[in-house]
A protein has these predicted regions:
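Surface-exposed coil loops of outer-membrane beta-barrel proteins
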Residues: 22, 38, 43-60, 89-105, ...
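Outer-membrane beta-barrel pore domains
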Residues: 52-55, 89, 94-95, 99, ...
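Outer-envelope exported proteins of Gram-negative bacteria
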Residues: 30-34, 80-82, 119-121, 170, ...
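Residues on the lipid-exposed face of transmembrane beta-strands in outer-membrane beta-barrel proteins
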Residues: 33, 37, 63-72, 105-110, ...
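Cleavable N-terminal export/targeting peptides
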Residues: 1-26
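Short N-terminal segments immediately surrounding and downstream of signal-peptide cleavage
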Residues: 22-37
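Glycine- and aromatic-enriched membrane insertion/assembly motifs of diderm outer-membrane
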Residues: 56-87
Length: 355
Protein backbone atom coordinates (compact mmCIF):
# COMPACT_ATOMS: atom_id res chain seq x y z
CA UNK A 1 0.00 0.00 0.00
CA UNK A 2 2.83 2.38 0.90
CA UNK A 3 4.51 1.76 -2.45
CA UNK A 4 1.26 2.56 -4.30
CA UNK A 5 0.88 5.83 -2.41
CA UNK A 6 4.49 6.87 -2.94
CA UNK A 7 4.58 6.25 -6.69
CA UNK A 8 2.38 9.17 -7.83
CA UNK A 9 3.96 11.54 -5.32
CA UNK A 10 7.47 10.85 -6.62
CA UNK A 11 6.35 10.92 -10.24
CA UNK A 12 4.80 14.37 -9.84
CA UNK A 13 7.90 15.65 -8.07
CA UNK A 14 10.29 14.41 -10.72
CA UNK A 15 8.19 15.43 -13.73
CA UNK A 16 8.17 18.96 -12.40
CA UNK A 17 11.70 19.22 -13.80
CA UNK A 18 10.28 19.40 -17.29
CA UNK A 19 8.26 22.51 -16.50
CA UNK A 20 10.09 24.36 -13.75
CA UNK A 21 11.91 27.48 -14.85
CA UNK A 22 15.37 27.74 -13.30
CA UNK A 23 16.02 31.34 -12.31
CA UNK A 24 19.74 30.81 -12.63
CA UNK A 25 21.23 30.21 -16.06
CA UNK A 26 24.51 28.98 -14.60
CA UNK A 27 25.31 25.35 -15.36
CA UNK A 28 28.35 23.16 -14.96
CA UNK A 29 29.50 19.94 -16.60
CA UNK A 30 32.06 17.73 -14.89
CA UNK A 31 33.64 14.66 -16.46
CA UNK A 32 35.37 12.11 -14.26
CA UNK A 33 36.44 8.53 -14.79
CA UNK A 34 38.91 5.75 -14.24
CA UNK A 35 40.75 2.85 -15.84
CA UNK A 36 42.00 -0.19 -13.94
CA UNK A 37 43.79 -3.47 -14.52
CA UNK A 38 45.13 -6.21 -12.26
CA UNK A 39 47.20 -9.38 -11.97
CA UNK A 40 46.15 -12.13 -9.57
CA UNK A 41 47.92 -15.30 -8.47
CA UNK A 42 45.92 -17.85 -6.49
CA UNK A 43 48.07 -19.95 -4.16
CA UNK A 44 45.87 -22.98 -4.91
CA UNK A 45 46.35 -22.28 -8.63
CA UNK A 46 42.62 -22.22 -9.31
CA UNK A 47 40.27 -19.37 -10.14
CA UNK A 48 37.48 -21.49 -8.63
CA UNK A 49 38.78 -20.42 -5.20
CA UNK A 50 37.24 -17.02 -5.82
CA UNK A 51 33.69 -16.32 -4.54
CA UNK A 52 33.68 -12.51 -4.75
CA UNK A 53 33.11 -10.00 -7.54
CA UNK A 54 35.46 -8.76 -10.27
CA UNK A 55 38.64 -10.83 -9.60
CA UNK A 56 37.71 -14.29 -10.86
CA UNK A 57 41.07 -15.26 -12.38
CA UNK A 58 44.38 -16.99 -11.69
CA UNK A 59 47.82 -16.09 -13.07
CA UNK A 60 46.30 -13.61 -15.50
CA UNK A 61 46.69 -9.93 -16.27
CA UNK A 62 43.21 -8.61 -16.93
CA UNK A 63 41.65 -5.19 -17.58
CA UNK A 64 38.96 -4.26 -15.11
CA UNK A 65 36.85 -1.36 -16.37
CA UNK A 66 37.09 1.87 -18.31
CA UNK A 67 34.62 4.27 -16.74
CA UNK A 68 33.48 7.79 -17.55
CA UNK A 69 30.90 9.83 -15.66
CA UNK A 70 29.14 12.91 -17.05
CA UNK A 71 27.56 15.11 -14.40
CA UNK A 72 25.71 18.25 -15.51
CA UNK A 73 24.25 20.58 -12.87
CA UNK A 74 22.22 23.73 -12.70
CA UNK A 75 21.05 25.31 -9.47
CA UNK A 76 18.16 22.84 -9.12
CA UNK A 77 18.59 20.09 -11.69
CA UNK A 78 21.28 17.44 -12.10
CA UNK A 79 21.78 14.88 -14.86
CA UNK A 80 24.19 11.96 -14.41
CA UNK A 81 25.28 9.49 -17.09
CA UNK A 82 27.82 7.05 -15.64
CA UNK A 83 29.16 4.54 -18.17
CA UNK A 84 31.52 1.61 -17.77
CA UNK A 85 33.08 -0.87 -20.20
CA UNK A 86 34.88 -4.10 -19.38
CA UNK A 87 34.39 -7.24 -17.33
CA UNK A 88 33.88 -5.30 -14.09
CA UNK A 89 31.01 -3.30 -15.61
CA UNK A 90 29.56 -6.44 -17.17
CA UNK A 91 29.47 -8.26 -13.82
CA UNK A 92 27.96 -5.19 -12.16
CA UNK A 93 25.09 -5.07 -14.70
CA UNK A 94 24.78 -8.86 -14.91
CA UNK A 95 21.08 -8.77 -15.88
CA UNK A 96 21.74 -6.63 -18.97
CA UNK A 97 23.10 -7.64 -22.37
CA UNK A 98 25.36 -5.90 -24.85
CA UNK A 99 25.73 -2.15 -24.68
CA UNK A 100 23.04 -1.93 -21.97
CA UNK A 101 25.53 -3.48 -19.54
CA UNK A 102 27.66 -0.37 -19.97
CA UNK A 103 25.16 1.81 -18.11
CA UNK A 104 26.23 1.95 -14.46
CA UNK A 105 24.07 4.92 -13.52
CA UNK A 106 21.65 7.07 -15.48
CA UNK A 107 19.40 9.46 -13.60
CA UNK A 108 18.03 12.97 -13.28
CA UNK A 109 17.53 14.81 -9.98
CA UNK A 110 15.46 17.86 -9.11
CA UNK A 111 15.93 19.89 -5.91
CA UNK A 112 13.00 22.28 -5.38
CA UNK A 113 14.67 23.42 -2.15
CA UNK A 114 17.83 22.83 -0.14
CA UNK A 115 16.14 20.19 2.03
CA UNK A 116 14.60 17.87 -0.57
CA UNK A 117 15.76 16.20 -3.78
CA UNK A 118 13.79 13.92 -6.13
CA UNK A 119 15.63 11.40 -8.32
CA UNK A 120 14.39 9.21 -11.19
CA UNK A 121 16.44 6.66 -13.10
CA UNK A 122 19.06 4.08 -12.17
CA UNK A 123 21.67 4.64 -9.45
CA UNK A 124 24.18 2.70 -7.32
CA UNK A 125 22.73 1.19 -4.17
CA UNK A 126 22.79 2.93 -0.81
CA UNK A 127 23.42 -0.43 0.86
CA UNK A 128 26.97 -1.34 1.89
CA UNK A 129 30.42 0.19 2.30
CA UNK A 130 32.16 -0.70 -0.96
CA UNK A 131 31.52 0.67 -4.46
CA UNK A 132 31.88 -0.61 -8.01
CA UNK A 133 34.41 2.11 -8.95
CA UNK A 134 37.86 0.85 -7.86
CA UNK A 135 39.27 4.33 -7.16
CA UNK A 136 36.65 4.74 -4.42
CA UNK A 137 37.80 1.64 -2.52
CA UNK A 138 41.09 1.04 -0.73
CA UNK A 139 40.97 -2.74 -1.21
CA UNK A 140 40.88 -3.87 -4.83
CA UNK A 141 39.16 -7.22 -4.28
CA UNK A 142 35.60 -7.08 -3.01
CA UNK A 143 33.91 -8.27 0.16
CA UNK A 144 31.37 -11.09 0.33
CA UNK A 145 28.75 -8.58 1.42
CA UNK A 146 29.27 -6.40 -1.65
CA UNK A 147 29.27 -9.45 -3.92
CA UNK A 148 25.87 -10.56 -2.68
CA UNK A 149 24.33 -7.21 -3.39
CA UNK A 150 22.36 -5.28 -4.08
CA UNK A 151 24.36 -3.44 -6.77
CA UNK A 152 21.93 -0.80 -8.02
CA UNK A 153 18.30 0.32 -8.11
CA UNK A 154 16.08 1.68 -10.87
CA UNK A 155 13.10 3.72 -9.80
CA UNK A 156 12.15 6.88 -7.93
CA UNK A 157 13.43 8.23 -4.63
CA UNK A 158 13.30 11.32 -2.45
CA UNK A 159 16.18 12.53 -0.27
CA UNK A 160 15.57 14.84 2.69
CA UNK A 161 18.12 16.83 4.69
CA UNK A 162 17.51 17.93 8.28
CA UNK A 163 20.65 19.65 9.52
CA UNK A 164 23.20 16.92 10.19
CA UNK A 165 20.67 14.16 9.54
CA UNK A 166 19.26 12.85 6.30
CA UNK A 167 16.59 10.44 5.13
CA UNK A 168 15.76 8.71 1.87
CA UNK A 169 12.70 6.77 0.78
CA UNK A 170 12.05 5.28 -2.63
CA UNK A 171 10.48 2.61 -4.78
CA UNK A 172 12.37 0.60 -7.39
CA UNK A 173 12.31 -2.32 -9.78
CA UNK A 174 13.38 -5.71 -8.46
CA UNK A 175 17.00 -5.46 -7.34
CA UNK A 176 19.64 -5.07 -10.08
CA UNK A 177 17.10 -4.83 -12.91
CA UNK A 178 17.12 -1.73 -15.10
CA UNK A 179 14.67 -3.44 -17.43
CA UNK A 180 12.34 -6.04 -15.93
CA UNK A 181 11.74 -8.95 -18.37
CA UNK A 182 8.26 -9.62 -19.70
CA UNK A 183 6.31 -12.49 -18.20
CA UNK A 184 7.83 -12.36 -14.71
CA UNK A 185 6.69 -10.96 -11.38
CA UNK A 186 7.27 -7.21 -11.41
CA UNK A 187 6.71 -6.00 -7.87
CA UNK A 188 8.34 -2.81 -6.65
CA UNK A 189 10.92 -2.82 -3.87
CA UNK A 190 10.91 -0.35 -0.99
CA UNK A 191 14.14 1.58 -0.29
CA UNK A 192 14.96 3.56 2.84
CA UNK A 193 17.92 5.19 4.58
CA UNK A 194 18.64 7.30 7.63
CA UNK A 195 22.01 9.05 7.88
CA UNK A 196 23.87 11.18 10.38
CA UNK A 197 26.93 13.02 9.06
CA UNK A 198 27.78 15.49 11.77
CA UNK A 199 31.53 15.43 11.14
CA UNK A 200 34.34 13.23 9.80
CA UNK A 201 34.76 11.94 13.34
CA UNK A 202 31.52 9.98 13.13
CA UNK A 203 29.13 9.18 10.28
CA UNK A 204 26.44 6.50 10.30
CA UNK A 205 24.07 5.18 7.64
CA UNK A 206 21.13 2.87 8.38
CA UNK A 207 19.86 1.21 5.21
CA UNK A 208 16.96 -0.96 4.11
CA UNK A 209 15.78 -2.65 0.92
CA UNK A 210 12.95 -5.14 0.62
CA UNK A 211 10.40 -6.59 -1.76
CA UNK A 212 9.34 -9.53 -3.89
CA UNK A 213 11.87 -10.68 -6.49
CA UNK A 214 11.08 -11.98 -9.96
CA UNK A 215 11.61 -15.57 -8.70
CA UNK A 216 8.72 -15.00 -6.18
CA UNK A 217 11.03 -14.95 -3.13
CA UNK A 218 10.58 -12.17 -0.58
CA UNK A 219 13.67 -10.33 0.63
CA UNK A 220 14.28 -7.93 3.50
CA UNK A 221 17.79 -6.58 4.01
CA UNK A 222 18.97 -4.30 6.81
CA UNK A 223 22.41 -2.71 6.66
CA UNK A 224 24.59 -0.34 8.68
CA UNK A 225 27.70 1.60 7.65
CA UNK A 226 29.82 3.56 10.13
CA UNK A 227 32.93 5.62 9.35
CA UNK A 228 35.22 7.50 11.70
CA UNK A 229 38.32 9.61 11.08
CA UNK A 230 40.26 9.44 14.33
CA UNK A 231 43.24 11.47 13.10
CA UNK A 232 44.90 12.66 9.89
CA UNK A 233 46.66 9.29 9.69
CA UNK A 234 44.11 6.79 10.98
CA UNK A 235 40.48 6.08 10.13
CA UNK A 236 38.14 3.14 10.26
CA UNK A 237 34.96 1.86 8.70
CA UNK A 238 32.40 -0.76 9.59
CA UNK A 239 29.72 -2.53 7.56
CA UNK A 240 27.17 -5.00 8.83
CA UNK A 241 24.27 -6.49 6.90
CA UNK A 242 21.60 -9.15 7.36
CA UNK A 243 19.18 -10.38 4.70
CA UNK A 244 16.14 -12.59 5.18
CA UNK A 245 14.81 -14.57 2.21
CA UNK A 246 11.42 -16.30 2.09
CA UNK A 247 11.17 -18.77 -0.80
CA UNK A 248 7.83 -19.48 -2.52
CA UNK A 249 6.80 -23.16 -2.27
CA UNK A 250 3.95 -22.93 -4.78
CA UNK A 251 1.33 -22.00 -2.20
CA UNK A 252 2.95 -19.51 0.13
CA UNK A 253 6.31 -18.07 1.12
CA UNK A 254 8.06 -20.42 3.52
CA UNK A 255 9.70 -19.34 6.77
CA UNK A 256 12.59 -16.99 6.14
CA UNK A 257 16.22 -18.05 6.03
CA UNK A 258 18.97 -15.50 6.36
CA UNK A 259 22.58 -14.73 5.57
CA UNK A 260 24.61 -12.00 7.21
CA UNK A 261 28.03 -10.40 7.24
CA UNK A 262 30.20 -8.03 9.24
CA UNK A 263 33.40 -6.26 8.20
CA UNK A 264 35.87 -3.88 9.83
CA UNK A 265 38.17 -1.63 7.76
CA UNK A 266 41.31 -0.24 9.40
CA UNK A 267 43.03 2.53 7.40
CA UNK A 268 46.51 3.89 8.08
CA UNK A 269 47.99 6.76 6.02
CA UNK A 270 51.55 7.58 7.15
CA UNK A 271 51.98 9.94 4.18
CA UNK A 272 49.70 11.35 1.46
CA UNK A 273 51.44 9.03 -1.03
CA UNK A 274 51.16 5.77 0.94
CA UNK A 275 48.39 4.03 2.83
CA UNK A 276 47.47 0.63 4.24
CA UNK A 277 44.04 -0.95 4.70
CA UNK A 278 43.17 -4.15 6.53
CA UNK A 279 39.70 -5.54 5.88
CA UNK A 280 38.49 -8.30 8.20
CA UNK A 281 35.14 -9.80 7.19
CA UNK A 282 32.98 -12.54 8.65
CA UNK A 283 30.34 -13.92 6.29
CA UNK A 284 27.69 -16.36 7.51
CA UNK A 285 25.79 -18.47 4.97
CA UNK A 286 24.35 -21.08 7.33
CA UNK A 287 21.45 -21.95 5.02
CA UNK A 288 23.48 -22.27 1.81
CA UNK A 289 21.88 -19.27 0.13
CA UNK A 290 24.96 -17.62 -1.38
CA UNK A 291 28.02 -19.92 -1.58
CA UNK A 292 27.61 -22.25 -4.61
CA UNK A 293 29.61 -25.32 -3.54
CA UNK A 294 28.54 -28.93 -2.81
CA UNK A 295 30.52 -28.91 0.46
CA UNK A 296 28.26 -26.13 1.74
CA UNK A 297 25.02 -27.65 0.45
CA UNK A 298 24.13 -29.61 3.60
CA UNK A 299 25.11 -27.32 6.47
CA UNK A 300 26.03 -24.07 4.77
CA UNK A 301 29.28 -22.38 5.72
CA UNK A 302 30.83 -19.31 7.26
CA UNK A 303 33.91 -17.54 5.97
CA UNK A 304 36.46 -15.36 7.73
CA UNK A 305 38.38 -13.33 5.15
CA UNK A 306 41.31 -10.97 5.78
CA UNK A 307 42.67 -8.66 3.10
CA UNK A 308 45.71 -6.40 3.46
CA UNK A 309 46.11 -3.76 0.74
CA UNK A 310 48.73 -1.07 0.24
CA UNK A 311 48.01 2.09 -1.75
CA UNK A 312 50.96 3.79 -3.47
CA UNK A 313 49.86 7.06 -5.07
CA UNK A 314 51.65 8.91 -7.87
CA UNK A 315 49.55 11.83 -9.11
CA UNK A 316 46.32 10.24 -10.40
CA UNK A 317 47.69 6.70 -10.38
CA UNK A 318 47.26 4.27 -7.47
CA UNK A 319 49.21 1.00 -7.30
CA UNK A 320 47.60 -1.61 -5.02
CA UNK A 321 49.54 -4.73 -3.97
CA UNK A 322 47.22 -6.97 -1.96
CA UNK A 323 47.34 -10.21 0.05
CA UNK A 324 44.14 -12.08 0.90
CA UNK A 325 43.42 -15.16 3.04
CA UNK A 326 39.93 -16.72 3.22
CA UNK A 327 39.10 -19.37 5.84
CA UNK A 328 35.86 -21.38 5.60
CA UNK A 329 34.08 -23.76 7.96
CA UNK A 330 33.67 -26.15 5.00
CA UNK A 331 36.10 -27.40 2.36
CA UNK A 332 34.95 -25.11 -0.44
CA UNK A 333 38.46 -24.30 -1.74
CA UNK A 334 41.07 -26.47 -3.49
CA UNK A 335 44.81 -26.98 -3.11
CA UNK A 336 47.33 -27.16 -5.96
CA UNK A 337 46.84 -30.93 -6.22
CA UNK A 338 43.07 -30.54 -6.48
CA UNK A 339 42.22 -31.82 -3.00
CA UNK A 340 39.65 -29.84 -1.02
CA UNK A 341 40.67 -27.44 1.74
CA UNK A 342 39.11 -24.88 4.07
CA UNK A 343 41.68 -22.16 3.31
CA UNK A 344 42.53 -20.17 0.19
CA UNK A 345 44.94 -17.32 -0.40
CA UNK A 346 46.05 -15.09 -3.23
CA UNK A 347 48.28 -12.18 -4.18
CA UNK A 348 47.00 -9.38 -6.37
CA UNK A 349 48.62 -6.35 -7.96
CA UNK A 350 46.30 -3.67 -9.35
CA UNK A 351 46.76 -0.31 -11.06
CA UNK A 352 43.98 2.29 -10.96
CA UNK A 353 44.12 5.61 -12.81
CA UNK A 354 41.39 8.15 -12.08
CA UNK A 355 40.64 11.68 -13.24
Amino acid sequence: MLRKLLAPIFTIGVLTTAFAQDSSKTSALSITGSVDAYYKYDFGQSKANNYTSFTNSHNRIEPGMASVKFDHKTSKVELVADLGFGKRAQEFSYNDDGILAGVKQLYVSYSPSSVVKFTAGSWATHVGYELVDPQLNRNYSMSYMFTNGPFFHTGLKADFTFGKSGAMIGIANPTDFKYVPEGVINRKFLLAQYSYTGSDLFKVYLNYVGGKAIDTSKTNQFDIVVTSKLSDKFSLGYNGTVASIKVWDGVKNMDGKSWWGSALYLNLDPTPAFGLTLRSEYFNDKYDLKIPHPAAAMNGCNIFANTLSANFKVDNLTIIPEFRIDNSSQEIFTKKDGTPTKTAGNFLLAAVYSF
